[in-house]
């Protein structure tokens, strides 16, 4: 959790292990490598008014629960958007997170980008995702997620191996469900950005991105006595910030999309 507009996260670098050369030899004490990363927390609010004569009579006796459900759904979509921004955006580093500190970049890196090649999502791109994660020594046990748009999700059905029961323990054509393939968890989001005719899909290893929450979620239903008709007010507020904490675990997957 976070309690300010700016928050930091200390990342520990990879640590190797040394061969024991002899008995009773002195320990070679090494300092673990730390890297501090900085994120920004923001507050997001929604306030909805309900006229107790007009709105309630026209819709239903108690629309409050449905409105709250819609507000929470909108809040979750915004969280997805912020996580996607953090996945491919610049990350400020340094002890104090000053503007003069060199930001950590991911864009333009061939190691962390799979070029579109004029195609949508393909078997070759999925294989490349697995290969990049392996090159970065991401453990096999770590969950790996690929975020696709609806059109890219549809393109999966054109991959024969994806639809074959020999390669996939589910039946995508029968169920219409995109879940897992080649050890990758496939999820859909319409918040992925687009550059020209290419959709910037994202693959990431669990633990490479974080969503830090600030103050506890506020929800309140009250009567606004300062307004004519004493309408009900539904108020919602959340505070959070997203941050990429590892370049090694994030890959931009460019996919052509008309």
Which residue stretches match the model-derived regions?
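Sequence/fold signature of self-assembling virion shell proteins
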Residues: 3-15, 34-41, 58, 103-121, ...
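Alpha-helical scaffold segments that mediate packing/assembly in large oligomeric complexes
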Residues: 54-132, 252-258
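Structured, hydrophobic secondary-structure cores that serve as assembly/anchoring elements
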Residues: 14, 34-63, 126-159
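Short Gly/aromatic-enriched secondary-structure transition segments
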Residues: 22-29
């Amino acid at each position: 959790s976070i309690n300010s507009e700016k928050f930091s996260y200390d990342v520990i670098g990879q640590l190797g292990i040394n061969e024991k050369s002899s008995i009773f030899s002195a320990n070679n004490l090494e300092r673990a490598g730390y890297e501090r990363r900085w994120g920004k927390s923001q507050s997001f609010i929604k306030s909805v008014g309900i006229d107790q004569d007009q709105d309630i009579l026209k819709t239903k006796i108690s629309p409050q629960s449905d409105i709250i459900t819609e507000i929470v759904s909108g809040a979750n979509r915004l969280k997805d958007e912020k996580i996607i921004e953090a996945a491919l955006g610049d990350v400020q580093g340094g002890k104090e997170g000053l503007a003069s500190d060199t930001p950590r970049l991911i864009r333009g890196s061939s190691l962390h980008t799979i070029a579109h090649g004029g195609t949508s999502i393909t078997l070759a791109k999925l294989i490349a995702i697995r290969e990049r994660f392996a090159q970065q020594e991401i453990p096999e046990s770590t969950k790996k997620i690929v975020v696709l748009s609806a059109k890219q999700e549809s393109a999966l059905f054109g991959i024969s191996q994806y639809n074959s029961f020999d390669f996939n323990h589910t039946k995508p054509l029968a169920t219409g469900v995109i879940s897992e393939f080649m050890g990758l968890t496939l999820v859909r989001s319409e918040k992925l950005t687009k550059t020209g005719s290419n959709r910037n899909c994202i693959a990431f290893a669990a633990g490479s991105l974080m969503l830090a929450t600030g103050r506890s979620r506020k929800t309140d239903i009250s009567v606004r006595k300062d307004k004519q008709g004493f309408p009900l007010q539904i108020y919602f507020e959340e505070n959070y910030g997203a941050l990429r904490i590892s370049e090694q675990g994030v890959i931009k997957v460019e996919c052509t999309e008309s």
